[in-house]
Structure formats: C-alpha cells, structure tokens
From Swiss-Prot:
InterPro entries: Pentatricopeptide_rpt, TPR-like_helical_dom_sf. One of its GO terms (cellular component) is mitochondrion. The keyword Metal-binding does not apply. This is Pentatricopeptide repeat-containing protein At2g13420, mitochondrial. It comes from Arabidopsis thaliana (Mouse-ear cress). PROSITE patterns: PPR (PS51375). PPR repeats lie at residues 172-202, 206-240, 241-285, 286-320, 321-355, 356-390, 391-425, 426-460. Belongs to the PPR family. P subfamily. Residues 1-19 form a transit peptide. It comes from the Eukaryota. Signal peptide: none annotated. The keyword Mitochondrion applies.
C-alpha cells in the first residue's frame, strides 16, 4: 500500500452535491462569523451556562473574572451559546445595557439567527425594530429562519417589508435569488416557482435564478419539471451554462434507481442525453459532469463502467480530481477488487493528487466487511506514519471493526489515538464505543465513557440511554444506574430542553 507524500483535505462524496449547491448560489451569502478556537469564549460560555440565574443579572459574574469583551469575543461566545438561546439572549441584553454598549450589527445578526432557530420570531422582530442600523443581511437571516420553520408566507412578507427598514432601499435580483434558493433548499420549490412567476417582471431573471429552480425540482425528484424549466429558460433567451446542466445531471443520477438492471440502464441513457445536449449547445462537460456520472456508477457497483468513464474523461484532456478518484476507489473496493484500487491509488499520487482520509476509508470499510483485522491494522499504521492522518470517520470505522471482532485491546489503542488526534471523538465515536462495551457487558467502562460523552457536551441518542439502562437493570446494577442517573441530572443544564426529549420508560426485567 502506497503511503501519502502530500496532505489532502478530507473529502466525502456527499460534498459533491454540496459543492454543486454552492456553485448555483444566487450570489448573496450570509456572512455570519464561523466558530473559531477561543479559550476566553469557552470560559465565558461555560460560566454563563453553569451559573445562569434567570432572576439575577450576569454582570457580577463577568466583572469578577475581569473579562474584557471585544466584538470578536462576543461573536465567539454567542456562537457557543447557540444551543442555549435563553442564556444567549440574556448575555446579549446585558451587553446592550452597558453604559457603552459593545453590540455590533454582526452580533445583532447572530442573536437573530440563534433566536430564529428556536422560532422566537416575536423577539426577533422586536430586536430588528430596536436596531440602529439594519442591513439586507439581517432580513435575509430572518427570511431563512422563517422558511426553515415552515413559515413560508411570513418569510415572503418579511422580504417585502424589508425596504421599510432599509431607508426604502429595494432588494435586487441577487437578494430575490437568495429567497428562491432558500425556498428550494428547504423543499418549497412549488412556492418558489409561484413567487418567481409573480415577481419576475419586477426583479428580472438570469441563468442563476433558473438554475436554482431547476435544482429545486431535482431535489423533489421531479426531473420532468426540471427539464420543463430548462426549456422555458432557453425559450426566454437565457442560455444555460455548464452549471445548469450539471444540476440537471446530478438530479438524474442522484434519483437513479440502481435496480433492476433495466431501470439503471434507462437512467444511464438519460444521463448520456444530457451530455449530448450539452455538446449540441457548445458546452463541454467538465470534471464535475463526469464525477456525477462516475458516482452513480460507483453506487451501482459497476466497476467496468466506472473505469471506462474515467478513461474517456482522461482521453478528453480532463484531469480527474480527488472526488473522481475516490468514487472509483470506492467502487473497486466495494466490488472486492482491492488490488486494482491500490494500483489506482498509486496512479493518483503519480498524477500529483494525494489520497485523503476519505479515500482510505473506502479500504477500511471493505476490511470491516471482510472482518480482516490484519489488513485494517496494517493500513492504519501506515496512515499514522504518513502525512495523511486518519479522520474521525476513519477512527469510527476502525472502532466498529474491532468492536465487532471482540478485540477490545485494539479498540482501546485506537480510542487513545483518537483522543490524542486534532479532531477528537464525536457523537458517533462515543456511541459506537458505549454500545460495543454494553454488548461485551463491560458496564463500568460503558458508564465511564457515557458520562465522559455528556461532560464533553454530546447529547447521547435515545437508543444509547435505553441500551445502558436496560443492560444495567438486567445485570442487577441498580446502584450503578442510580449513581449514573444522578450524574445525568447534574449535567442536564448543558442541554436544556433537549435533555427532556429522552424520558426513561419504566423497564421490568
């Protein structure tokens, strides 16, 4: 097995669709801050969560710790409080009450987004009224959250009312495209089409808007309507581009029935028709076009078709990307053709493209299916010694492999490596480990990792609660369960109302 000579960013096949979604964006994106490492923000957020009292202000807590609140620190703190909306709002109102308020338009937008996620729209509207300076972004955040909550009519009304708060600055085509794009992404394509038909005279239209609507119909698996809008687009004098055709192609391939064989072949013919139409209009398929079709072949385990398509791609002078190679490697591994997959891995590196952890995960999943502990460990040790380090998903696959094989010492080794890695364990990691320990009746260890999971801020799945609960009772470990339940009650404030979604049904042995 060839070692990596260069670091590649992790890639997952679902990112292909996400990338297409990004490409067809109408041009307006919400520029909200992203979560960044910040020890001060961690300290403040944990202090507010632990010591929050709805009947007392939080000024003393912050002043006693001598904390100076900069705009960036406020943003990072609010991001860490996004799952505790009441505390986030109290913190924000405290900032506004200061003699020199340290709130900014960005912090207003953040709290509006946080409150919108939990449908506190009355509070959001009041905050917008109280804002000194609103921006188009403020209203588009509100529009997005209303649509996400299923309040589509209110979202359109908020879009229409925005100019009253923006000194009569009317929205343009780019913001109109954002409205349509958001409606389509949340599955309200029919309403998006209605809004488009009503207002296209006012806002106009372009290839991006039509591409958004075509993508919306594809999301609903209505390829017939997507093709109809493509025809309407051309008849309106707007030329489709390669992105438009890739969206349609992705819709056809994503909804493709892989079985029986007749249906799969029909979908292949439909995809080839899109390629033919592209060429007739003078548009050459690009690497994304080929990658979409390759991914469909890979899902159907059609190794020969996948390899032939890659050869055709190279013959046309199109260099495969890491996404393309990963699709082919996945197909070869799932078909049991590991030697060919390894040869392709060498070809990747020779072409200057280093496999990512996702590429290696294809091998690990095949080893898991084969119950090949030696093959998995050999590859894992090569990755550890190379430049491409295992991702959290890699560790999760390995944990599942060795838990199933009952090799708990190896599980411990992998878990220690995961905790020492840059990413660390996630919810899936803890879930796999706790369930695996329960299956081996290692109750003490299972309880320990269960508590650790909660302390790290991961809300366990209901099934995990029930598995541990029933297992402890069946094993006459009621005292252990009571101690564990007490710990859970102490930690429940971390999750707020979410914690209440996991009630325990009385269980009898």
């Amino acid at each position: 097995m060839l070692l990596l000579k260069q670091i590649s960013p992790p890639f997952h096949l679902h990112q292909l669709r996400r990338r297409i979604s990004t490409i067809i964006s109408a041009g307006f994106t919400l520029n909200l801050p992203k979560l960044e490492p910040s020890s001060d923000a961690e300290l403040i957020s944990q202090m507010l969560i632990t010591n929050h009292n709805p009947f007392h202000f939080m000024e003393s807590s912050l002043q006693l710790n001598g904390i100076s609140l900069t705009p960036n620190l406020i943003h990072q703190t609010l991001l860490r409080l996004r799952h505790n909306s009441k505390i986030a709002l109290s913190f924000f109102q405290y900032l506004r009450s200061l003699p020199s308020p340290s709130t900014t338009p960005t912090s207003f937008n953040l709290i509006i987004d946080i409150l919108g996620r939990v449908r506190q729209f009355d509070v959001v509207r009041q905050l917008i009224v109280e804002m000194d300076q609103t921006s188009p972004e403020t209203f588009l955040i509100l529009v997005k959250r209303l649509i996400a909550a299923g309040l589509t009519r209110q979202a359109v009304r908020a879009f229409d009312d925005a100019p009253c708060f923006l000194e009569n600055r009317r929205f343009r085509l780019v913001e109109f495209g954002f409205l349509l794009d958001t409606l389509c992404k949340y599955g309200y394509t029919k309403m998006a089409v209605g809004v488009f038909n009503e207002r296209k005279e006012e806002f106009g239209s372009d290839e991006k808007v039509y591409t958004i609507l075509i993508a919306g119909w594809c999301k609903l698996r209505r390829i017939d309507m997507a093709e109809k809008f493509l025809v309407e687009m051309i008849e309106s004098g707007i030329e489709p581009n390669v992105v438009t055709y890739n969206v349609l192609l992705n819709g056809i391939c994503r909804t493709a029935s892989l079985h029986p064989e007749e249906r799969f072949e029909r979908n292949v013919r439909n995809a080839e028709k899109v390629f033919d139409e592209m060429r007739q209009r003078g548009i050459e398929p690009d690497v994304t076009s080929f990658s979409i079709v390759l991914h469909m072949y890979s899902r159907a385990h059609k190794a020969e078709l996948t390899l032939d398509k890659m050869k055709l791609m190279k013959a046309k002078g199109i260099s495969p990307t890491i996404e393309t190679y990963t699709s082919v490697v996945k197909c070869l591994c799932s078909c049991g053709r590991l030697e060919e997959a390894e040869e392709l891995l060498e070809t990747m590196v020779e072409s200057g493209i280093s496999p990512s952890s996702a590429t290696y995960n294809c091998f690990f999943k095949e080893y898991k299916g084969r119950k090949d502990a030696n093959g998995a460990m050999n590859l894992y040790r090569k990755m550890k010694n190379g430049l491409c380090k295992p991702s959290t998903q890699t560790y999760n696959v390995l944990l599942g492999t060795f838990i199933n094989l009952g090799k708990m010492e190896t599980v411990k080794e992998i878990w220690d490596d995961l905790k020492a890695s840059e990413t660390g364990p996630d919810l899936d990691s803890y879930t796999s480990l706790v369930h695996g320990l329960c299956s081996k009746e290692k109750w003490k260890e299972a309880c320990g990792y269960f508590v650790e999971m909660i302390e790290r801020g991961f809300l366990p799945q209901k099934l995990t609660f029930e598995t541990l609960y029933k297992g402890l009772i069946q094993s006459n470990k009621m005292r252990t369960w009571r101690r564990l339940k007490k710990k859970l009650d102490e930690e429940s404030i971390t999750f707020g109302s979410e914690f209440q979604r996991y009630p325990f049904e009385p269980y009898k042995r």
